Every structure is written in structure tokens, then in C-alpha cells.
A protein has these predicted regions:
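RNA-binding basic/glycine-rich loop and surface signature characteristic of RAMP-family CRISPR effectors
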Residues: 1-219
């Protein structure tokens, strides 16, 4: 019998951070923030990025031999939860494995800083420059202006829901938790090994201050 549960995901980032969007924010802005399309201008971490981050983090847990409530995190389990290509790990060609988890976007409050199309926005950007390693001077034409959706140093919480649909008979039996609780615990643990989110991470953007996964509904 199939089960369904909802897990609330929450990631708090420290500004500056950037999930790059395609919109033109304002004249002179080279990298604009990705926002929702519901008319509220909420910054988001897109669902596919959330899935990719958590899948990679779970793989890290598997490689480290982590167990959660007596159940080892394995690539087979990760494949069941996140899906995998048809030709991966001996799978049948042309028959990809669908993932049990459906992720939604993680959304931050709207208009933290307002968007750059609504002035005044004097502090809503951050300027970067590339340095020539041989001369120590700024490279010609290597100035980048990045949109900020929150003041530097401010913590911004992105939250959303992941829906899990699975047959508990396909999951190992945890020692004390239900299968749904185990999946929530896995995602919570995986969030804890993600140091940064978004673009420009090597420049110090997207630091994760805290993150959590909590089961909110099961049926």
C-alpha cells in the first residue's frame, strides 16, 4: 500500500547569496536574483536545485557509511527516493527509476529589499571585481554587479514542501521510526552537510546558517 507524507524544508542563508535569474533587474545589474512568478517578487531556491543539493548530500552520507536509526544510507535507497537514470547501477535501459520525492521551490518572504525596479534601492547590489594574478591589478572589463535581495549579513529563511509517495515495503525497517519519519530524518541530516547554496559560493556567497526538515503530514 502506498503512503504519502509532506516534509517541510527550511534553509536559512546569510546575505550575500544569489540564485541567478534570467530577468533584467535594472540597468547596470549583471546578475539578477531568481524570483517566483506569482507576482509577489519572492526570492526562491528552485525545486531542481533543492533536489540536486539533497541528492548530492545524501550521496556524501552514503559514501561516509552513515546510518540513521539503524538503517544505512545506500545508493539504492537514494535511487528510490530521488530517482536515477535508466542505465545507472545496472538499471534496465530505457526504464528510468522515478523518484519518490517531489520537491517544491523554497521561498523567502517577498520584498525583503524590494526589487531593483522599484527605487530607491541604493544598497541593493554588490560589486565584485576580478584581479589579475600576475599584476595584482583589476582585470579590464571584469567588474560584476550582483543584485542583493537582503542587506549584507542578514539571515533570510527559505521554506517549502517536499512530498514523498512510496510503498513502505520497499524501505528497510528503522529501529524506532516509521518509514516516513526516517525519510524526514535523512533529509534533515543531509541538509546539515550542505555548507552553501546558490551561485558564487567560492566568493563566499550563500552561506547556510541553519537548515531543517520536519515531517508535517502523513497518510
Amino acid at each position: 500500500m502506498g503512503l504519502r507524507c509532506d516534509i517541510t524544508l527550511s534553509i536559512t542563508l546569510v546575505s550575500p547569496f544569489l540564485m541567478p535569474g534570467l530577468d533584467v533587474a535594472a540597468l547596470g545589474i549583471d546578475a539578477a536574483a531568481l524570483r517566483d512568478d506569482c507576482g509577489k517578487g519572492c526570492p526562491i531556491i528552485p525545486a531542481d536545485q533543492v533536489k540536486g543539493l539533497l541528492s548530492a548530500a545524501c550521496t556524501t552520507l552514503a559514501e561516509a557509511g552513515v546510518e540513521i536509526d539503524g538503517v544505512a544510507v545506500t545508493r539504492t535507497l537514494i535511487g528510490r527516493l530521488f530517482g536515477r537514470p535508466s542505465d545507472e547501477d545496472g538499471g534496465e535501459w530505457g526504464a528510468p527509476q522515478r523518484g519518490a520525492i517531489i520537491f517544491g521551490d523554497l521561498t523567502a518572504p517577498p520584498q525583503i529589499f524590494g526589487d531593483l525596479t522599484a527605487p530607491p534601492q541604493k544598497a541593493a547590489s554588490f560589486t565584485r571585481v576580478s584581479i589579475d594574478g600576475s599584476t595584482g591589478a583589476a582585470k579590464n572589463g571584469a567588474l560584476q554587479t550582483v543584485e542583493l535581495v537582503a542587506p549584507l549579513g542578514q539571515r533570510v529563511t527559505f521554506s517549502g514542501t517536499a512530498t514523498v509517495r512510496f510503498d513502505p515495503r520497499t524501505m528497510p525497517a528503522p529501529a524506532t521510526k516509521t518509514a516516513a519519519e526516517w525519510v524526514a530524518a535523512l533529509l534533515h541530516t543531509a541538509l546539515g552537510v550542505i555548507p552553501a547554496v546558490g551561485g558564487l559560493k567560492t566568493a563566499g556567497f550563500g552561506q547556510v546558517a541553519e537548515a531543517s526538515a520536519t515531517m508535517t503530514h502523513a497518510e
